[in-house]
Amino acid sequence: MLILAIDTSTAATSVAVLGATAGPILRTQIDGRRHAEVVAPLLREALREADVDPADIGLVACGVGPGPFTGLRVGIATAIAFGFARDVPVVGVCSLDVTARAAVRDLGTSVTVLSRARKSEVCWASYDDRAMRIAGPIIRREPVNITGACVGDAGPVDEVRYPSALDLAELVVERMA
């Protein structure tokens, strides 16, 4: 099944196509103020490079945050509109779960993902070394109960990471299995 994935929950706008014969395709642009301007061109580029007709997409996956409202609204609206137009299911996934999955895979350890929330607040969640959530998501001024490496885009992190639409699509496939 061809999956289109979209995440705009952070400063990154990320679009991916998974399941195409051309292989997995990922397009990402980091600019937290231009989600609305870049999501459609990235979507078009990803579909074109994957050599996929939009009518062939069988599922749309969308990162649902937590994150800034404007960015979330752009990604969720784009995913729902695409799904509605193509009459295919749309599934939402916590963007912290997506970031954690990739970080645990790459670092081989438990992680805490920190993401910008409202004003001076941070949203965080902790994950074990299998990327299973063990705490959170919680919004606070400062994270507590930090487990393992800290990754994300807010606060004191060991590594800045944004959710990847390709990791989002792969996580949806894992959860459907």
What residue ranges belong to the model's regions?
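N-terminal beta-alpha supersecondary unit
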Residues: 1-64
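Glycine-rich nucleotide phosphate-binding loop and flanking beta-alpha elements
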Residues: 12, 68, 119-121
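Surface "functional belts" at beta-alpha junctions
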Residues: 22, 28-34, 88-175
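Bulky hydrophobic/aromatic packing residues
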Residues: 27, 42, 50, 72-76, ...
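Short amphipathic alpha-helical face segments that pack within enzyme cores
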Residues: 38-41, 77, 81, 98, ...
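Residue-level signal for alpha-helix termini/capping positions
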Residues: 48-51, 84, 104-105
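DPxDG-like acidic metal-binding loop motif
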Residues: 59-92
